[in-house]
Amino acid sequence: MKILLDLLLLLPLLIVCCLESFVKLFIPKRRKSVAGEIVLITGAGHGIGRLTAYEFAKLKSKLVLWDINKHGLEETAAKCKGLGAKVYTFVVDCSNREDIYSSAKKVKAEIGDVSILVNNAGVVYTSDLFATQDAQIEKTFEVNILAHFWTTKAFLPAMMKNNHGHVVTVASAAGHISVPFLLAYCSSKFSAVGFHKALTDELAALQITGVKTTCLCPNFVNTGFIKNPSTSLGPALEPEEVVNRLMNGILTEQKMIFSPSSIAFLTILERILPERFLAVLKRKINIKFDAVIGYKMKAQ
């Protein structure tokens, strides 16, 4: 009975918050400056990580770029330097906790306190449960979520001490809506979304108001990791479009970014619609991509 009374008492606040959100739709939010900020981006040698580095370089941030691919990392760094940015590169295996911690120690000693951390590195294996090797499942979790814990543990304390910073989680629409034949990937991205939400709540509980969090959840992105993706929602997104949304979200301190925006609507539908209807809807959306299927149906 008490909870019902509490909910009724909160009703005026709900109305005020809804009106406030509606008004904000028509008022462009001021973008913060990131000039001079030390920005560390994992997975910076390709795709979203590379393009995000370019955007921060244009905004005069100091860049710390991590990737396991030395050649890709050097290409990204060269372009960023051409844009006038100060750039530091580290070849780091984000599936290796000790490599992350030792590299983080070097960054703090040689460059300074990271104030914007972009956890972007990721791997994906397009296969069903039986065709996905145990080592691939382990690596998916090591890179796609455990690395977020290790990097954040390494760099968040300085942000909290200064009450200034930003932790960015690059997740996926597959962290909200499951997809067949991406079992390990979906599981890791659901974890990444949960990491972002729990970290956000933890910072609020500790009254650390100056450290912001942002989570990016795009649909299929045309980066070459998933072969021949298609859905009835439209073609795979170009990475430039996704990074534009990401940068706008970081600079305006948005908590959750969906790309395209319709993904947000689908996440709501999944929570309120009957399961039978959802099954039909998912068939209509018709997500397809090249995948290895290990399960063999028995002959009838």
UniProtKB/Swiss-Prot annotation:
GO BP, one annotated term: steroid biosynthetic process
Keywords attached to this entry: Endoplasmic reticulum, Lipid biosynthesis, Lipid droplet, Lipid metabolism, NADP, Oxidoreductase, Signal, Steroid biosynthesis
Q: What is the E.C. number?
A: 1.1.1.62
Q: Provide the leader sequence positions.
A: 1-18
Query: Which residues of this protein are catalytic?
Result: Y185 (proton acceptor)
User: CDD domains this protein is in?
Assistant: 17beta-HSDXI-like_SDR_c
Q: According to its UniProt record, where is this protein located?
A: Endoplasmic reticulum; Lipid droplet
Annotated positions binding NADP(+): 40-67, 189
Report the GO molecular function annotations: estradiol 17-beta-dehydrogenase [NAD(P)+] activity
Q: Which reaction does it catalyse?
A: 17beta-estradiol + NAD(+) = estrone + NADH + H(+); 17beta-estradiol + NADP(+) = estrone + NADPH + H(+)
Supply the Pfam families for this chain.
adh_short
Top EC group: oxidoreductase
Q: Which residues bind substrate?
A: S172
Q: Which InterPro entries match?
A: NAD(P)-bd_dom_sf, SDR_fam
A GO cellular component annotation here is: endoplasmic reticulum
Q: Which family does it belong to?
A: Belongs to the short-chain dehydrogenases/reductases (SDR) family. 17-beta-HSD 3 subfamily.
UniProt function note: Can convert androstan-3-alpha,17-beta-diol (3-alpha-diol) to androsterone in vitro, suggesting that it may participate in androgen metabolism during steroidogenesis. May act by metabolizing compounds that stimulate steroid synthesis and/or by generating metabolites that inhibit it. Has no activity toward DHEA (dehydroepiandrosterone), or A-dione (4-androste-3,17-dione), and only a slight activity toward testosterone to A-dione.
Name this protein carries in UniProt: Estradiol 17-beta-dehydrogenase 11
Task: Supply the source organism for this entry.
Answer: Macaca fascicularis
Instruction: List the lineage, top down.
Output: Eukaryota, Metazoa, Chordata, Craniata, Vertebrata
Gene name per UniProt: HSD17B11
